[in-house]
Amino acid sequence: MQLKTVEGDVAKLAARGEAPTAGLSDFLVRDTPVAYAFIGPAFFLLLFLVAYPFVLSLWFSLSDARVGETGSFVGLDNFARLLRSGIFLQTLQNSIVFTAAALTLKTVLGMILALLLFRLVRFKRLIRGAVLLPFIVPTALSTLVWWWMFEPLYSVVNWTLKSLHIVNYDIPWLPDPYLAMFTVILVNTWRGLPFFAITLLAGLVAIPRELYEAAESDGAGPIGRFWHVTVPLLKPVLAVVILFSAIFTLADFNIVYVLTKGGPFNMTHLFATYSFVLGLQSGQIGQGAAVSLFLFPILLAVVFVQLRMVRKAAMYD
Protein backbone atom coordinates (compact mmCIF):
# COMPACT_ATOMS: atom_id res chain seq x y z
CA MET A 1 0.00 0.00 0.00
CA GLN A 2 2.83 2.39 0.88
CA LEU A 3 4.65 1.52 -2.35
CA LYS A 4 1.54 2.27 -4.44
CA THR A 5 1.13 5.61 -2.67
CA VAL A 6 4.72 6.62 -3.44
CA GLU A 7 4.33 5.56 -7.07
CA GLY A 8 1.09 7.56 -7.31
CA ASP A 9 2.81 10.68 -5.94
CA VAL A 10 5.60 10.30 -8.48
CA ALA A 11 3.02 9.95 -11.32
CA LYS A 12 1.21 13.13 -10.20
CA LEU A 13 4.47 15.07 -10.19
CA ALA A 14 5.25 13.77 -13.68
CA ALA A 15 1.80 14.89 -14.95
CA ARG A 16 2.51 18.44 -13.72
CA GLY A 17 5.94 18.42 -15.33
CA GLU A 18 7.62 18.27 -11.93
CA ALA A 19 8.78 14.68 -12.06
CA PRO A 20 11.76 13.99 -9.85
CA THR A 21 14.95 12.63 -11.24
CA ALA A 22 15.31 8.89 -11.74
CA GLY A 23 17.70 8.65 -8.79
CA LEU A 24 15.28 10.33 -6.39
CA SER A 25 12.32 8.24 -7.56
CA ASP A 26 14.34 5.07 -7.08
CA PHE A 27 15.33 6.28 -3.63
CA LEU A 28 11.69 6.90 -2.70
CA VAL A 29 10.44 3.57 -4.01
CA ARG A 30 13.19 1.22 -2.87
CA ASP A 31 13.79 0.40 0.80
CA THR A 32 17.49 -0.52 0.57
CA PRO A 33 18.92 3.02 0.10
CA VAL A 34 16.80 4.28 2.98
CA ALA A 35 18.11 1.50 5.19
CA TYR A 36 21.70 2.34 4.26
CA ALA A 37 21.03 6.00 4.99
CA PHE A 38 19.87 5.14 8.50
CA ILE A 39 22.61 2.67 9.41
CA GLY A 40 25.37 4.69 7.75
CA PRO A 41 26.07 7.08 10.67
CA ALA A 42 26.10 4.23 13.18
CA PHE A 43 28.40 2.20 10.94
CA PHE A 44 30.95 5.01 10.61
CA LEU A 45 30.74 5.70 14.34
CA LEU A 46 31.52 2.05 15.12
CA LEU A 47 34.27 2.10 12.52
CA PHE A 48 35.87 5.07 14.25
CA LEU A 49 35.33 3.97 17.86
CA VAL A 50 35.88 0.20 17.51
CA ALA A 51 37.66 -0.77 14.30
CA TYR A 52 40.31 1.97 14.37
CA PRO A 53 41.37 1.37 18.02
CA PHE A 54 41.45 -2.39 17.36
CA VAL A 55 43.71 -2.02 14.33
CA LEU A 56 45.91 0.43 16.24
CA SER A 57 46.18 -2.01 19.16
CA LEU A 58 47.09 -4.76 16.72
CA TRP A 59 49.93 -2.63 15.35
CA PHE A 60 51.15 -1.72 18.84
CA SER A 61 51.16 -5.40 19.86
CA LEU A 62 53.48 -6.17 16.94
CA SER A 63 55.88 -3.35 17.79
CA ASP A 64 58.18 -2.33 20.65
CA ALA A 65 56.36 0.99 21.09
CA ARG A 66 56.78 2.80 24.38
CA VAL A 67 55.26 5.98 25.77
CA GLY A 68 56.60 8.84 23.64
CA GLU A 69 58.17 6.47 21.09
CA THR A 70 56.57 5.05 17.95
CA GLY A 71 58.64 1.88 18.06
CA SER A 72 59.51 -0.58 15.31
CA PHE A 73 58.02 -3.83 14.06
CA VAL A 74 59.00 -6.86 16.18
CA GLY A 75 56.47 -9.43 14.98
CA LEU A 76 55.19 -11.83 17.63
CA ASP A 77 58.01 -11.09 20.06
CA ASN A 78 55.68 -9.39 22.57
CA PHE A 79 53.38 -12.42 22.66
CA ALA A 80 56.32 -14.81 23.06
CA ARG A 81 57.69 -12.76 25.97
CA LEU A 82 54.29 -12.73 27.65
CA LEU A 83 53.97 -16.50 27.42
CA ARG A 84 57.31 -16.76 29.24
CA SER A 85 56.21 -14.27 31.90
CA GLY A 86 55.13 -15.66 35.25
CA ILE A 87 52.96 -12.59 35.93
CA PHE A 88 51.06 -13.03 32.67
CA LEU A 89 50.46 -16.74 33.31
CA GLN A 90 49.22 -15.81 36.79
CA THR A 91 46.94 -13.21 35.17
CA LEU A 92 45.56 -15.85 32.81
CA GLN A 93 44.84 -18.17 35.73
CA ASN A 94 43.27 -15.34 37.74
CA SER A 95 41.00 -14.40 34.82
CA ILE A 96 39.74 -17.97 34.41
CA VAL A 97 39.09 -18.45 38.13
CA PHE A 98 37.51 -15.01 38.52
CA THR A 99 35.19 -15.41 35.52
CA ALA A 100 34.15 -19.00 36.30
CA ALA A 101 33.45 -18.31 39.98
CA ALA A 102 31.60 -15.02 39.38
CA LEU A 103 29.48 -16.48 36.56
CA THR A 104 28.54 -19.51 38.66
CA LEU A 105 27.52 -17.36 41.62
CA LYS A 106 25.58 -14.90 39.47
CA THR A 107 23.74 -17.67 37.65
CA VAL A 108 22.69 -19.55 40.80
CA LEU A 109 21.90 -16.50 42.93
CA GLY A 110 20.29 -14.71 40.00
CA MET A 111 17.92 -17.62 39.44
CA ILE A 112 17.01 -17.74 43.14
CA LEU A 113 16.45 -13.98 43.26
CA ALA A 114 14.36 -14.07 40.07
CA LEU A 115 12.13 -16.80 41.53
CA LEU A 116 11.68 -14.79 44.74
CA LEU A 117 10.83 -11.62 42.80
CA PHE A 118 8.41 -13.59 40.64
CA ARG A 119 6.48 -14.76 43.70
CA LEU A 120 6.26 -11.33 45.29
CA VAL A 121 2.74 -10.11 45.97
CA ARG A 122 3.12 -6.84 47.88
CA PHE A 123 5.45 -3.95 47.00
CA LYS A 124 6.40 -5.78 43.82
CA ARG A 125 7.45 -2.74 41.77
CA LEU A 126 9.30 -1.08 44.65
CA ILE A 127 11.39 -4.15 45.45
CA ARG A 128 12.15 -4.88 41.80
CA GLY A 129 13.35 -1.31 41.36
CA ALA A 130 15.52 -1.56 44.48
CA VAL A 131 17.14 -4.74 43.16
CA LEU A 132 18.45 -2.77 40.17
CA LEU A 133 20.37 -0.26 42.33
CA PRO A 134 23.74 -2.10 42.31
CA PHE A 135 23.58 -2.18 38.51
CA ILE A 136 22.65 1.50 38.22
CA VAL A 137 25.20 3.04 40.61
CA PRO A 138 28.50 3.92 38.85
CA THR A 139 30.94 1.04 39.25
CA ALA A 140 33.86 3.09 40.54
CA LEU A 141 31.69 4.80 43.17
CA SER A 142 30.12 1.60 44.50
CA THR A 143 33.49 -0.18 44.49
CA LEU A 144 34.99 2.62 46.59
CA VAL A 145 32.31 1.91 49.19
CA TRP A 146 33.22 -1.77 49.12
CA TRP A 147 36.91 -0.87 49.51
CA TRP A 148 36.06 1.20 52.57
CA MET A 149 34.13 -1.76 54.00
CA PHE A 150 37.04 -4.19 53.50
CA GLU A 151 40.18 -2.05 53.84
CA PRO A 152 42.41 -3.29 56.71
CA LEU A 153 42.49 -0.27 59.04
CA TYR A 154 38.83 0.76 59.36
CA SER A 155 36.98 -2.25 57.98
CA VAL A 156 33.26 -2.07 58.75
CA VAL A 157 32.95 -5.78 58.01
CA ASN A 158 35.64 -6.67 60.57
CA TRP A 159 34.12 -4.32 63.15
CA THR A 160 30.71 -5.98 62.68
CA LEU A 161 32.13 -9.50 62.91
CA LYS A 162 34.06 -8.65 66.08
CA SER A 163 31.06 -6.88 67.62
CA LEU A 164 28.97 -10.02 67.07
CA HIS A 165 31.82 -12.11 68.57
CA ILE A 166 32.10 -14.17 65.40
CA VAL A 167 35.85 -13.47 65.18
CA ASN A 168 38.30 -11.83 67.57
CA TYR A 169 40.85 -10.58 65.03
CA ASP A 170 40.96 -8.42 61.92
CA ILE A 171 40.50 -10.48 58.76
CA PRO A 172 42.95 -9.31 56.03
CA TRP A 173 40.38 -9.17 53.23
CA LEU A 174 42.54 -7.22 50.78
CA PRO A 175 46.16 -7.86 51.91
CA ASP A 176 45.74 -11.65 51.77
CA PRO A 177 46.07 -12.97 48.17
CA TYR A 178 43.30 -15.57 48.37
CA LEU A 179 40.90 -13.41 50.38
CA ALA A 180 41.53 -10.56 47.93
CA MET A 181 40.42 -12.78 45.04
CA PHE A 182 37.37 -13.83 47.06
CA THR A 183 36.56 -10.15 47.70
CA VAL A 184 36.74 -9.07 44.06
CA ILE A 185 34.59 -12.07 43.06
CA LEU A 186 32.07 -11.11 45.75
CA VAL A 187 31.87 -7.48 44.59
CA ASN A 188 31.59 -8.48 40.92
CA THR A 189 28.78 -10.89 41.82
CA TRP A 190 26.96 -8.16 43.75
CA ARG A 191 27.37 -5.81 40.81
CA GLY A 192 26.12 -8.23 38.14
CA LEU A 193 23.41 -10.01 40.11
CA PRO A 194 20.59 -7.56 39.19
CA PHE A 195 21.25 -8.09 35.47
CA PHE A 196 20.76 -11.83 35.88
CA ALA A 197 17.77 -11.53 38.20
CA ILE A 198 15.76 -9.02 36.15
CA THR A 199 16.46 -10.75 32.83
CA LEU A 200 15.53 -14.17 34.19
CA LEU A 201 12.46 -12.62 35.79
CA ALA A 202 11.35 -11.43 32.35
CA GLY A 203 11.81 -14.98 31.09
CA LEU A 204 9.76 -16.39 33.97
CA VAL A 205 6.91 -13.97 33.30
CA ALA A 206 6.81 -15.11 29.66
CA ILE A 207 6.31 -18.81 30.55
CA PRO A 208 2.61 -19.75 30.12
CA ARG A 209 0.92 -20.71 33.41
CA GLU A 210 -0.87 -23.56 31.64
CA LEU A 211 2.37 -25.51 31.44
CA TYR A 212 2.79 -25.42 35.22
CA GLU A 213 -0.83 -26.46 35.70
CA ALA A 214 -0.40 -29.35 33.29
CA ALA A 215 2.79 -30.47 35.06
CA GLU A 216 1.07 -30.23 38.44
CA SER A 217 -1.88 -32.29 37.20
CA ASP A 218 0.63 -34.95 36.10
CA GLY A 219 1.91 -35.14 39.66
CA ALA A 220 5.03 -32.97 39.38
CA GLY A 221 6.07 -31.20 42.57
CA PRO A 222 7.77 -27.79 42.86
CA ILE A 223 11.21 -29.24 42.10
CA GLY A 224 9.89 -31.29 39.19
CA ARG A 225 8.12 -28.25 37.71
CA PHE A 226 11.31 -26.24 38.05
CA TRP A 227 13.54 -28.79 36.29
CA HIS A 228 11.11 -29.92 33.62
CA VAL A 229 9.26 -26.66 32.85
CA THR A 230 11.18 -23.62 34.08
CA VAL A 231 14.76 -24.60 33.25
CA PRO A 232 14.13 -25.86 29.67
CA LEU A 233 12.12 -22.77 28.76
CA LEU A 234 14.71 -20.44 30.31
CA LYS A 235 17.69 -21.99 28.51
CA PRO A 236 17.73 -19.45 25.64
CA VAL A 237 17.49 -16.56 28.11
CA LEU A 238 20.17 -18.08 30.34
CA ALA A 239 22.51 -18.59 27.40
CA VAL A 240 22.23 -14.95 26.31
CA VAL A 241 22.63 -13.61 29.86
CA ILE A 242 25.67 -15.78 30.53
CA LEU A 243 27.19 -14.73 27.20
CA PHE A 244 26.99 -11.01 27.95
CA SER A 245 28.03 -11.47 31.56
CA ALA A 246 31.03 -13.59 30.56
CA ILE A 247 32.23 -10.81 28.24
CA PHE A 248 31.78 -8.09 30.88
CA THR A 249 33.30 -10.20 33.67
CA LEU A 250 36.36 -11.33 31.72
CA ALA A 251 37.06 -7.74 30.67
CA ASP A 252 36.41 -6.24 34.12
CA PHE A 253 38.71 -3.40 35.14
CA ASN A 254 37.06 -1.00 37.58
CA ILE A 255 36.30 -3.40 40.42
CA VAL A 256 39.73 -5.03 40.50
CA TYR A 257 41.69 -1.82 40.03
CA VAL A 258 39.81 0.13 42.70
CA LEU A 259 39.93 -2.69 45.26
CA THR A 260 43.40 -4.20 44.81
CA LYS A 261 45.11 -2.68 41.73
CA GLY A 262 45.96 -6.26 40.81
CA GLY A 263 47.69 -7.09 44.09
CA PRO A 264 48.72 -8.43 46.42
CA PHE A 265 51.58 -10.19 44.60
CA ASN A 266 49.68 -9.96 41.27
CA MET A 267 47.13 -12.47 42.59
CA THR A 268 44.10 -10.48 41.42
CA HIS A 269 45.39 -9.13 38.12
CA LEU A 270 43.02 -9.61 35.18
CA PHE A 271 43.77 -8.95 31.51
CA ALA A 272 42.43 -5.39 31.66
CA THR A 273 44.30 -4.36 34.83
CA TYR A 274 47.58 -5.99 33.79
CA SER A 275 47.35 -4.41 30.34
CA PHE A 276 46.79 -1.00 31.96
CA VAL A 277 49.69 -1.37 34.39
CA LEU A 278 52.07 -2.76 31.78
CA GLY A 279 51.08 -0.47 28.92
CA LEU A 280 50.38 2.88 30.58
CA GLN A 281 51.99 2.88 34.01
CA SER A 282 55.16 1.05 32.93
CA GLY A 283 55.18 2.68 29.50
CA GLN A 284 55.46 -0.59 27.54
CA ILE A 285 52.71 0.13 25.03
CA GLY A 286 53.52 -2.85 22.81
CA GLN A 287 53.33 -5.45 25.57
CA GLY A 288 50.26 -3.82 27.10
CA ALA A 289 48.48 -4.03 23.75
CA ALA A 290 49.54 -7.67 23.41
CA VAL A 291 47.98 -8.48 26.79
CA SER A 292 44.69 -6.85 25.79
CA LEU A 293 44.64 -8.75 22.49
CA PHE A 294 44.89 -12.06 24.34
CA LEU A 295 41.29 -11.36 25.34
CA PHE A 296 40.14 -11.54 21.72
CA PRO A 297 40.51 -15.31 21.06
CA ILE A 298 39.18 -16.12 24.53
CA LEU A 299 36.09 -13.96 24.05
CA LEU A 300 35.66 -15.38 20.55
CA ALA A 301 35.64 -18.91 21.98
CA VAL A 302 33.14 -17.91 24.67
CA VAL A 303 30.84 -16.31 22.09
CA PHE A 304 31.09 -19.37 19.81
CA VAL A 305 30.19 -21.80 22.61
CA GLN A 306 27.33 -19.67 23.90
CA LEU A 307 25.85 -19.13 20.43
CA ARG A 308 25.89 -22.90 19.89
CA MET A 309 24.02 -23.28 23.18
CA VAL A 310 21.45 -20.69 22.10
CA ARG A 311 20.99 -22.44 18.75
CA LYS A 312 20.56 -25.84 20.40
CA ALA A 313 18.06 -24.41 22.87
CA ALA A 314 16.09 -22.83 20.02
CA MET A 315 16.07 -26.13 18.10
CA TYR A 316 14.92 -27.91 21.25
CA ASP A 317 12.03 -25.49 21.63
What is each stretch, according to the model?
Residues M1-I39, R122-K124, L307-D317:
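Transmembrane alpha-helical segments of polytopic membrane transport and secretion proteins
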Residues V34-D317:
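A structural signal for multi-pass alpha-helical bundles of membrane permease subunits
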